[in-house]
């Protein structure tokens, strides 16, 4: 702040009215006079002073100086006066490579990517100059892989590929285009990697969800790089640990942070708070927060409040929230979201809505994330009133077209028992989204309410709309078929899942089919489904055994009980259930033999289970 004030004072004294102009002229301005002043204007975003300086450049005849004219182009680009910058470029008597670089970089920074690429192409054709900075600048604005590869070829032909600035830009470009493997190959090729190169590669890995490689790259840097990791490196590495829930490596990084004296850097400290919170070490997160002291900002406060909430320390979170004002800070949308979402996830609906009302009282507009969290908290008839209130806020916020909010609304009404309301919302939304989650909440909701035909209807509509069903979709519709005993439809969907969509049934799907076939008395078919599994779990045998008890099938019951006993040798339930089958069939000798087996194995009978059925 002090530096900026000095710059403003300097520029103001030199370029505003009367004496200032005399000062410039009396000191015989030269080609080194104007560029630093123009740079100061750019940093301050001071368009007015920049224009005054522009006039002085022209008046004193220094517009012909490439260095000064380039500084004008750069200044206008920095203060977002693109038209003025391009006009200066056009009027320049002679363009240099630096002028083209300033214009290309400025166009990219201001979002004029096509114009930047066009200017880059024109510069190549006209031969007005191109260097590694030009190529790196254009790579920085490239967002498609085809164009990026063409630029890569150009860099190779021009001999720029191995320059660290260009190599780093290529790593970033490939990462940005989702080609992290190509980014890794380019990273390996860069001969003299800078800390910026390592940071670009680590950031790219994180953007592409390959967090598991970040610790290895960080270790490579420490082992082979002549440069030390900086705050950006530490933030990225710590953030990766948070995503991986790698507490051990996170603690090692914390130790290194302290050794390098980065622990009081706001970004690094905030990343540590987030890492410890996600790794369920809330006490460590709190200690890091307290050690930040004067360097912590609202983001740090939001991180620790969120961390306390996700670790169930809601009282501490509220205490921290109440201290914000004493630190001269005001809660923002993220602060409120942390508390409201946290209380919602903890099932504390009253507290969640209490903070929601407080948020509204300070005229804070609820975010879509906040509304979604509150809707998820409304899960029964007792919270229906609250759910309807949030529906009103959804309408007020014109958020009825947001797929996540809409899905949460449907789910809320289904959970609260108003399937007809959920259906009205579903039917009104056109065109229907391709996200299967939107359809799944309808199918599972109908299934749980016993409206199985409606669940199947939605599934068929999903197929008509060419939506790709997920594994969860099949779980929901098979469960619905099981509840209504529709064996034919369930079997058809089970085959469809494998033959048409290529899914391998999970334990949940197998369980649904066993339950469906078992309820209908088709126990042999249920057993055949289990036999198709490579490693049947205890849950599928438990489901089959339950069906055997319902239909009094001692043969399959014995087989299921023995398999279940092998998988869970300490569990007495299979013997107790088998005993109840024998008792129902009045096979008392078998009941007694089961009792002896339980005694011999010293199994503790679970409460609620009877040996006599």
Swiss-Prot record:
InterPro entries: E_motif, Pentatricopeptide_rpt, PPR_At4g14850-like_plant, TPR-like_helical_dom_sf. Belongs to the PPR family. PCMP-E subfamily. GO terms for molecular function: RNA binding. PPR repeats lie at residues 30-64, 65-99, 101-126, 128-162, 163-193, 194-228, 230-264, 265-295, 297-331, 332-366, 367-401, 402-432, 435-469, 470-500, 506-539. GO terms for biological process: RNA modification. PANTHER family: PENTACOTRIPEPTIDE-REPEAT REGION OF PRORP DOMAIN-CONTAINING PROTEIN, PENTATRICOPEPTIDE REPEAT-CONTAINING PROTEIN. The lineage of its organism: Eukaryota, Viridiplantae, Streptophyta, Embryophyta, Tracheophyta. This is Pentatricopeptide repeat-containing protein At2g02750. Keywords: Repeat. Residues 540-613 are annotated as: Type E motif.
């Amino acid at each position: 702040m002090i530096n900026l004030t000095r710059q403003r004072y300097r520029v103001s004294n030199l370029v505003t009215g009367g004496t200032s102009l005399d000062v410039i002229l009396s000191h015989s301005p030269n080609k080194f006079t104007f560029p630093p002043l123009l740079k100061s204007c750019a940093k301050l975003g001071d368009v007015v002073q920049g224009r005054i300086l522009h006039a002085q450049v022209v008046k004193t005849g220094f517009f012909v100086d490439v260095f000064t004219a380039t500084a004008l182009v750069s200044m206008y680009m920095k203060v977002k006066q693109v038209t003025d910058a391009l006009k200066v470029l056009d009027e320049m008597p002679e363009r240099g490579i630096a002028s083209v670089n300033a214009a290309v970089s400025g166009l990219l920074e201001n979002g004029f990517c096509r114009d930047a690429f066009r200017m880059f192409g024109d510069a190549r054709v006209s031969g007005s100059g191109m260097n590694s900075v030009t190529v790196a600048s254009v790579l920085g604005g490239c967002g498609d892989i085809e164009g990026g590869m063409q630029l890569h070829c150009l860099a190779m032909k021009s001999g720029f590929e191995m320059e660290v600035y260009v190599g780093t830009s290529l790593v970033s470009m490939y990462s940005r285009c989702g080609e992290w493997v190509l980014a890794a190959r380019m990273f390996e090729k860069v001969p003299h990697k800078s800390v910026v190169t390592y940071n670009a590669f680590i950031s790219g890995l994180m953007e592409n969800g390959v967090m598991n490689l970040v610790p290895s790259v960080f270790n490579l840097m420490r082992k082979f790089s002549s440069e030390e990791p900086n705050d950006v490196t530490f933030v990225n590495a710590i953030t990766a640990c948070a995503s991986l829930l790698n507490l051990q490596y996170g603690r090692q990084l914390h130790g290194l942070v302290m050794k390098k004296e980065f622990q009081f850097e706001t970004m690094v400290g905030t990343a540590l708070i987030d890492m410890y919170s996600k790794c369920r070490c809330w006490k460590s997160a709190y200690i890091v927060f307290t050690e930040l002291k004067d360097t912590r900002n609202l983001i740090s406060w939001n991180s620790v409040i969120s961390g306390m909430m996700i670790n169930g320390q809601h009282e501490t979170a509220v205490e921290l929230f109440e201290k914000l004002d004493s630190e001269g800070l005001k809660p923002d949308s993220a602060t409120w979201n942390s508390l409201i979402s946290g209380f919602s996830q903890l099932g504390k609906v009253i507290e969640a809505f209490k903070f929601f009302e407080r948020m509204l009282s300070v005229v804070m507009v609820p975010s879509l994330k906040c509304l979604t969290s509150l809707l998820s908290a409304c899960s029964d008839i007792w919270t229906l009133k609250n759910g309807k209130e949030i529906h009103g806020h959804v309408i007020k916020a014109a958020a009825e077209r947001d797929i996540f909010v809409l899905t949460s609304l449907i789910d809320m009404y289904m959970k609260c028992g108003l399937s007809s309301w959920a259906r009205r919302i579903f039917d009104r939304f056109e065109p229907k989204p391709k996200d299967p989650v939107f359809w799944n909440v309808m199918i599972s909701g109908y299934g749980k309410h016993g409206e199985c035909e409606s669940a199947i209807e939605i599934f068929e509509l999903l197929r008509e709309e060419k939506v790709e069903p997920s594994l969860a979709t099949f779980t929901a519709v098979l469960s619905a078929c099981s509840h209504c005993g529709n064996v034919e439809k369930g079997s058809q969907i089970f085959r469809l899942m494998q033959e048409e969509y290529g899914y391998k049934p999970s334990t949940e799907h197998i369980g649904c089919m066993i339950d469906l076939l078992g309820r209908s008395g088709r126990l042999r078919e249920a057993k055949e489904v289990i036999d198709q599994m490579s490693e049947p779990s205890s849950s599928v045998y438990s489901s089959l055994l339950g069906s055997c008890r319902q239909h009094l099938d001692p043969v399959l019951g014995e087989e299921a009980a023995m398999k279940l006993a092998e998988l869970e040798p300490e569990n007495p339930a299979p013997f107790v259930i088998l005993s109840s089958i024998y008792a129902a069939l009045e096979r008392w000798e078998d009941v007694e033999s089961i009792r002896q087996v339980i005694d011999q194995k010293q199994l503790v009978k679970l409460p609620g289970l009877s040996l006599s059925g």
